[in-house]
Amino acid sequence: MSGPVPSRARVYTDVNTHRPREYWDYESHVVEWGNQDDYQLVRKLGRGKYSEVFEAINITNNEKVVVKILKPVKKKKIKREIKILENLRGGPNIITLADIVKDPVSRTPALVFEHVNNTDFKQLYQTLTDYDIRFYMYEILKALDYCHSMGIMHRDVKPHNVMIDHEHRKLRLIDWGLAEFYHPGQEYNVRVASRYFKGPELLVDYQMYDYSLDMWSLGCMLASMIFRKEPFFHGHDNYDQLVRIAKVLGTEDLYDYIDKYNIELDPRFNDILGRHSRKRWERFVHSENQHLVSPEALDFLDKLLRYDHQSRLTAREAMEHPYFYTVVKDQARMGSSSMPGGSTPVSSANMMSGISSVPTPSPLGPLAGSPVIAAANPLGMPVPAAAGAQQ
């Protein structure tokens, strides 16, 4: 065996090669810390593997913010997330990093973000119309094309990491904790993304992946939305996950993919993969979801959910698909919020409309000796995991 065949991204291949080193060399990044006394925690929104997330108030201007208190991880990982958020700040539909502070007692870093009035996706997705799905998918694509054009892969695209304020039709791509800079020829860790959204490249341990990983994850989101099946590929572990995919896309194309890149398949797959034909997307349509499905939706989905990462649409190509013609037409007519890339302006006045008069929450006071770092549970009550708790 001569090892796997190398692969390079079809687009934005050399973005980081042409940037100064300080753009992507996050280990050398010097973090500028803000003042933690400016923030007062209000309530816990949820917890993720790497963080706890709180709603808070910036007491200098009474604006709502979200504070993500990072659990102890390698400094390198924290610096990577900060550098990526700073590089992407102001991009279309990218969550805005407002400040970085440190608790004086525990020395725990905390990231302060713009506040998004999110609706839990499990509730929201059940109510979305065909047009809504097209609209929000297009908004995610703006964020993905932007971060890819900036030489960055998100690597954790999933509903929990897409905040939607449905009332204002505002979307933000959050949780850049697994994001990484793309360097052609580099081999990356395959232990990224969440199981149901992991691309085949991760499941077969192919490390020279690229931005196209995010496009697979987006395809999984689209399938779950139009077919009303959450998640669409429901594996019980990482091995079963590939089996679930193979039962839909077929084993023949999987073996073609493995052969093309000279991938050595884990012997554990021998007993569980079996032989499966490729299924037509139409077989997932039924009376409850048919109003969300159209020929162009299925064509678009088919061009995302491909084993071969090089065969998937890029974010920019996806935005030009007929599935989005009505959305593009409407945004052009509305002048696209007068912003490049059609994003909602990220001025604090616009972000915080209607909440600038929120009174400072006096009952809580500074928590656990610090306005940022809370006691175990500041509200003294069970906190359900919020959508986006993985942030």
From Swiss-Prot:
Segments for region (Interaction with beta subunit): 36-41
Give a GO molecular function annotation for the protein: kinase activity
Q: Where is the active site?
A: D156
Reactions that this protein is recorded to catalyse: L-seryl-[protein] + ATP = O-phospho-L-seryl-[protein] + ADP + H(+); L-threonyl-[protein] + ATP = O-phospho-L-threonyl-[protein] + ADP + H(+)
Localization per Swiss-Prot or TrEMBL = Nucleus
GO BP of this protein: apoptotic process; chaperone-mediated protein folding; DNA damage response; double-strand break repair; negative regulation of apoptotic signaling pathway; negative regulation of double-strand break repair via homologous recombination; negative regulation of proteasomal ubiquitin-dependent protein catabolic process; negative regulation of signal transduction by p53 class mediator
Identify the keywords attached in UniProt to this record, alphabetized: Apoptosis, ATP-binding, Biological rhythms, Cell cycle, Disease variant, Intellectual disability, Kinase, Nucleotide-binding, Nucleus, Phosphoprotein, Serine/threonine-protein kinase, Transcription, Transcription regulation, Transferase, Wnt signaling pathway
Q: Which residues carry this modification: Phosphothreonine?
A: T344, T360
The UniProt activity regulation field reads:
Constitutively active protein kinase whose activity is not directly affected by phosphorylation. Seems to be regulated by level of expression and localization.
Task: Please state every residue range assigned to the domain named Protein kinase.
Answer: 39-324
Question: Which coarse location class applies to the principal site listed for this UniProt protein?
Answer: nucleus
Task: Tell me where in this chain the PTM Phosphoserine is found.
Answer: S362, S370
Alphabetized PROSITE patterns for the sequence: PROTEIN_KINASE_ATP, PROTEIN_KINASE_DOM, PROTEIN_KINASE_ST
Q: InterPro entries this protein is in?
A: CK2_alpha (IPR045216), Kinase-like_dom_sf (IPR011009), Prot_kinase_dom (IPR000719), Protein_kinase_ATP_BS (IPR017441), Ser/Thr_kinase_AS (IPR008271)
Q: What post-translational modification does the entry describe?
A: Phosphorylated at Thr-344, Thr-360, Ser-362 and Ser-370 by CDK1 in prophase and metaphase and dephosphorylated during anaphase. Phosphorylation does not directly affect casein kinase 2 activity, but may contribute to its regulation by forming binding sites for interacting proteins and/or targeting it to different compartments.
Q: What class of enzyme is it?
A: transferase
Q: In which tissues is it expressed?
A: Expressed in gastric carcinoma tissue and the expression gradually increases with the progression of the carcinoma (at protein level).
Residue positions annotated to bind ATP are: L45, G46, R47, G48, K49, Y50, S51, E52, V53, K68
Q: Name one GO cellular component term.
A: PML body
Q: Can you tell me which family this protein belongs to?
A: Belongs to the protein kinase superfamily. Ser/Thr protein kinase family. CK2 subfamily.
PANTHER family reported in the protein's UniProt record? CASEIN KINASE II SUBUNIT ALPHA, CASEIN KINASE II SUBUNIT ALPHA-RELATED
Q: Reproduce the miscellaneous comment text.
A: Can use both ATP and GTP as phosphoryl donors. Phosphorylation by casein kinase 2 has been estimated to represent up to one quarter of the eukaryotic phosphoproteome. Casein kinase 2 has been found to be increased at protein level and up-regulated at the level of enzyme activity in the majority of cancers. However, elevated levels of casein kinase 2 are present in certain normal organs such as brain and testes.
Q: How does it assemble?
A: Heterotetramer composed of two catalytic subunits (alpha chain and/or alpha' chain) and two regulatory subunits (beta chains). The tetramer can exist as a combination of 2 alpha/2 beta, 2 alpha'/2 beta or 1 alpha/1 alpha'/2 beta subunits. Also part of a CK2-SPT16-SSRP1 complex composed of SSRP1, SUPT16H, CSNK2A1, CSNK2A2 and CSNK2B, which forms following UV irradiation. Interacts with RNPS1. Interacts with SNAI1. Interacts with PML (isoform PML-12). Interacts with CCAR2. Interacts with HIRIP3.
Role according to the record: Catalytic subunit of a constitutively active serine/threonine-protein kinase complex that phosphorylates a large number of substrates containing acidic residues C-terminal to the phosphorylated serine or threonine. Regulates numerous cellular processes, such as cell cycle progression, apoptosis and transcription, as well as viral infection. May act as a regulatory node which integrates and coordinates numerous signals leading to an appropriate cellular response.
Write down what this protein is called.
Casein kinase II subunit alpha
Q: Give the organism the record lists.
A: Homo sapiens
Gene name in the database record: CSNK2A1
